[in-house]
Amino acid sequence: MSRRTLMLLSVATVAVSASAFAFGGWASISIEDLPDHFIVGKATQLSFVVKQHGVTPLDDLSPTIEARAADGSGNVQATATRGRAKGQYLATFTIPRAGDWRVRVKSGFGPSDITLPPMPAVAANSVAPVLTDYEHGRRLFAAKGCVNCHVHGAVDSKPLVESGPNLTEKKFDAAYLALWLANPAIRPPTKANQVMPNQGLSPREIGALVAFVNNGKVAATK
């Protein structure tokens, strides 16, 4: 995939359309330090940031988290509290039994929610399943807010603003995509309000997202 294609992608990503403003806008949710799995009976704290239109941190919301067993056998709910940073919230919950669980984060800002792909909960004395870069990236695609503007067939989520291209069949130069995810400003937007936010991704998160988008090809990270 050429750099020109990546430039066009960056212009489209997280584009704030006039219709979005007309209907009161939307908010992105970005989960910080997503765990690889849950431990049964042990409290998990999720920290996340809510930003209007993916840009402006939103304080004084009342976000909630719901974790549902993938087999429908149970659910856990938690109310988030304010964190130290602007727009940051913390929610603590405990998964009661082993199995796959889906976590939904409700921002408290209209219908701006995200639902993560199923994540395993394991007993404290059990060996956790191996997490591949691809699967890690698939979860991050939702957790870091990529789903706000992009469709990907491997992630069951509808974009809040359909401004970005469908990434299901896309592949990009891995090294350049890694640089771009680390610093979206290397491709400044050509139009106002069409900004790819910098999510402060770690090298591991960048490598996982590259592996997911490119269907397994991992970029070298330093």
Predicted regions and their residues:
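Electrostatic cytochrome c docking/interface patches
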Residues: 122-142
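Beta-strand-rich structural segments
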Residues: 42-56, 91
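Short pre-active-site segment immediately N-terminal to redox-active cysteine/selenocysteine motifs
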Residues: 142-148, 153, 205
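N-terminal signal peptide c-region/cleavage motif recognized by signal peptidases
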Residues: 15-19
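Proline/serine/threonine-rich low-complexity linkers at boundaries of modular beta-sandwich domains
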Residues: 20-28
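Short flexible loop/turn segments that cap and initiate beta-strands
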Residues: 52-78, 161
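Extracytoplasmic electron-transfer domains, predominantly the class I c-type cytochrome c fold
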Residues: 157-219
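Residue-level recognition of secondary-structure-to-loop junctions
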Residues: 83, 89-97
